Each structure stands twice: as C-alpha cells, then as structure tokens.
Amino acid sequence: MAGRGLISDEYQNVLCKMGEHIVYLDGLDQDSSWVIAREPLHSAADNYVIRRACGNASNAKTGKGPGLSFALKAHRLLKNASLIGPDFQIGLIPTAVGGSRIEYWRPGAVLFNRLIAQVRAGVRIASENGRNAKVRGILFYQGESDACQEDLAEYYRTFLQVSSR
C-alpha cells in the first residue's frame, strides 16, 4: 500500500479542504508525531534501506496510495450515518514497504515487528496528547511481489498468520 501514483497539486488541495479529519503518524517510532494527512503517507515508512533489507533494492519514489482515499471515504460514510461526531478523526499509521513479500510480514518477522512498534508508538503519542486512540482496523494490501507465487496454499497460510494477529 505504499503507493507509487502521481500526486497532483489539485489532489493535495482537495486534501487540505478536508480539514483535520484524517491524520497520520509521520516518522518512525520515537520521532513520530500525528499530523494532518498528506501524500505521500509512506515517505518515512517506505524508505530505501528498509526495502533493501527485504530484498527489494529498487529506488522507486513513494507516491499516492489507497490509504488516504480509503480513510476519507470511511470518514464520510461514518459521518453520514451519524456514527461519529463532527470532530472525530481517523488516524493512519503507515507501515507499508513497497515490493515486500508477505513472508516479511509474518508474526516475528522484521516488518511485522516494525508494524507493531509503529502502532504502539501511535497509540502512546496520541495518549500523551490527550487523545483516546484505539486501533479499529487494518487496511492490508499485498500485491505484486507475491503475484506469481507457485505455492498458493503456503501464501494463504502466511496471509492468515499475518491477518489473524
């Protein structure tokens, strides 16, 4: 979900008009802070050093992904259904690493451990700022690196391990 889509000024202007309803955890671990969401969400999370450690040495530029559009739509639907108040915020914690294989997301693997650390940091930082943050869901999009997986049964076993945590 790291995203490689082009980011236009027009798209960023639309995001600015959305106000402070969507925020994201910008930075890694202790250096993180909650800020108004802008693309690219994954500029810190999806860096070259992390991709290289997972066997993807491409230097692809991070761009627009599906996370922010998903959050904007979710906020609109929840608000229209009167399930949230006018000041409710959705917080995104970007952890995607473009080009990573699902095996790096297994419980105990490097990216899984990093994901858990980021979520804990996000909840802690929100709490320190007087916010009552709760993890309510996860948007997991696994794609191209496992598209030609020969052993689909093993892929789905791994996916179930990742998604059941």
Regions found by a protein language model. Name each.
Residues M1-R165:
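Cell-envelope and extracellular/periplasmic
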